[in-house]
UniProtKB/Swiss-Prot annotation:
InterPro entries: EF-Ts_dimer_sf (IPR036402), Transl_elong_EFTs/EF1B (IPR001816), Transl_elong_EFTs/EF1B_dimer (IPR014039), Transl_elong_Ts_CS (IPR018101), UBA-like_sf (IPR009060). It comes from the Bacteria. GO terms for cellular component: cytoplasm. The keyword Protein biosynthesis applies. Associates with the EF-Tu.GDP complex and induces the exchange of GDP to GTP. It remains bound to the aminoacyl-tRNA.EF-Tu.GTP complex up to the GTP hydrolysis stage on the ribosome. Residues 81-84 are annotated as: Involved in Mg(2+) ion dislocation from EF-Tu. Belongs to the EF-Ts family. This is Elongation factor Ts. One of its GO terms (molecular function) is translation elongation factor activity. Gene3D superfamilies: 1.10.286.20, DNA helicase RuvA subunit, C-terminal domain, Elongation factor Ts, dimerisation domain. It is found in: Cytoplasm. Keywords: Cytoplasm, Elongation factor, Protein biosynthesis. Disulfide bonds: none annotated.
Length: 294
């Protein structure tokens, strides 16, 4: 005869696992009221659900920066909808992942997923649990571990609560300056620290395109070279952080601003949630219904 499942048992299992009421009840029925077996059942069900959800497009989510001494971690964790991105459980997961990666500095994504968090579970286990709670595909998409020396400083900035994250390293400047540069990086999205970091083949290609563009405009060849250099300077100011007009003072470049504070640009990393992912057309009514249905 099947064991009768009480409301108290359902509440206890929900408190321990954060799953929905119906999932908790099903697990207790399947395990005949045995709490440990019910938890195992939910873990197995969560893994199955995570695998099922892994085919869904996860293009929302949050980016985060965590500093730990001379190490900083910048991460992006994705969800399917922005509903989940504002969920407390999802936010706690993002914080846990950022803390763990900053502390343990894994070499790649597989190593990161296998890391043990403060509560003894792995990052992968934590992701599976969050998938179980939210009924969405949740993924650690990418991360970077950034290092500095004792004489250098980090600056970090989150835009719109974590839709864009940036971390920079400056040499010889203070943290306030570094934060201003991080804000600039988040807003303007440079590709390289300086023109010296731009591959020669890309510069050569751009120079040739600009030359042909000027010739096609019918410009005399004797002034084409001067025009190309002027347009190339504009191109550099669009992709090189050092050459970009500083977002808080357009009369000076970022490198000039940093130099005025006694510093030098070292490196930066910028993540924008969902960049490069083809997003499905939003259907608000369906998103709401999916949340209701769990």
């Amino acid at each position: 005869m099947a064991s009768k499942i009480t409301a108290a048992q359902v509440k206890e299992l929900r408190d321990k696992t954060q799953v929905g009421m119906m999932d908790a009840k099903k697990a207790l029925v399947a395990s005949e009221g045995d709490m440990d077996k019910a938890i195992d059942f939910l873990r197995e069900k969560g893994i199955a659900k995570a695998k099922k959800k892994s085919g869904n497009v996860a293009a929302n989510g949050l980016a985060r920066v965590k500093e730990d001494g001379n190490t900083a971690a910048i991460i992006e964790v994705n969800s399917e909808t922005d509903f989940v991105a504002t969920n407390d459980t999802f936010n706690a997961l993002v914080d846990t992942i950022a803390d763990t990666i900053a502390e343990k500095q894994p070499a790649d994504l597989d190593a990161a997923l296998a890391l043990t968090t403060a509560d003894g579970s792995t990052i992968n286990d934590a992701i599976v649990k969050t998938t179980q709670v939210t009924s969405e595909n949740v993924q650690l998409r990418r991360f970077a571990v950034v290092k500095k020396t004792d004489g250098q400083v980090f600056g970090s900035y989150l835009h719109q609560g974590g839709q864009i994250a940036a971390v920079v390293v400056l040499d010889g400047a203070d943290e306030a300056t570094a934060k201003d540069v991080a804000m600039h990086v988040a807003a303007i999205n440079p590709e390289f620290v300086s023109r010296d970091d731009i591959p020669a083949e890309r510069l050569d290609h751009e120079r040739e395109v600009l030359k042909q563009e000027a010739l096609n405009e019918g410009k005399p060849e004797k002034i084409v070279e001067k025009m190309v250099e002027g347009r190339l300077h504009k191109f550099l100011s669009e992709i090189s952080l050092a050459d970009q007009p500083f977002v808080k003072d357009g009369d000076q470049t970022v490198s000039q601003f940093v130099a005025s504070k006694g510093g030098k640009l070292v490196t930066f990393v910028r993540y924008e949630v969902g960049e490069g992912i083809e997003k499905p057309v939003a259907d608000l009514a369906k998103e709401v219904q999916d949340q209701i249905n769990g």
